[in-house]
């Protein structure tokens, strides 16, 4: 586990991203992706996971928000992977159910060094502001694949797209915070002896 500020710069023809992450922070975030609703979600994620994050993304938002959202997920996942592995002295597993008014979303995750995403019961279409709601799944997939975490997120109920997506980000945040909780009785939390 790396309890320090990690930094990354990632530049492609579609996005130019610089980011900093500290996994044992206070939830302080400076987010500027050019996608207002996504900034709001990342701030909520950082706040409830107690991550300190700085993210600056200049993307081809004149085309679509997809590249910016996915690439920010890649960057966050890459930083999480660097910070987390090898796993030692933490809980490893985390889960959470977060409600926001009529919406409820569950998240269970395993800092297993095995990438997998289950994203269930999100059948909504449309946008929140200018944000296509299916981009939330692209973000979670990019994070899980690049952080090598097993991530299950499921909508339990909800009608308002804003509430549903925000509950998903917050549920992921709380589950991650719980999985990262330090436990001095745990060395490597695996019967294999390594993750």
Curated annotation (Swiss-Prot):
InterPro entries in the record: IGPD_sf, ImidazoleglycerolP_deHydtase, ImidazoleglycerP_deHydtase_CS, Ribosomal_Su5_D2-typ_SF
Main location: cytoplasm
Location of this chain's protein in the cell: Cytoplasm
Keyword Cytoplasm: yes
Gene3D superfamilies: Imidazole glycerol phosphate dehydratase, domain 1
Pathway: Amino-acid biosynthesis; L-histidine biosynthesis; L-histidine from 5-phospho-alpha-D-ribose 1-diphosphate: step 6/9
Catalysed conversion reaction: D-erythro-1-(imidazol-4-yl)glycerol 3-phosphate = 3-(imidazol-4-yl)-2-oxopropyl phosphate + H2O
Entry GO MF terms: imidazoleglycerol-phosphate dehydratase activity
GO biological process: L-histidine biosynthetic process
EC number per UniProt: 4.2.1.19
One GO cellular component, as annotated: cytoplasm
Keyword presence, Cytoplasm: yes
Pfam families the UniProt entry points to: IGPD
Record key words, sorted: Amino-acid biosynthesis, Cytoplasm, Histidine biosynthesis, Lyase
NCBIfam families: PRK00951.2-1, PRK00951.2-4
Family, as annotated: Belongs to the imidazoleglycerol-phosphate dehydratase family.
PANTHER family referenced in this protein's UniProt entry, alphabetically: IMIDAZOLEGLYCEROL-PHOSPHATE DEHYDRATASE (PTHR23133:SF2), IMIDAZOLEGLYCEROL-PHOSPHATE DEHYDRATASE HIS7 (PTHR23133)
Designated name of the protein: Imidazoleglycerol-phosphate dehydratase
Record organism: Campylobacter curvus (strain 525.92)
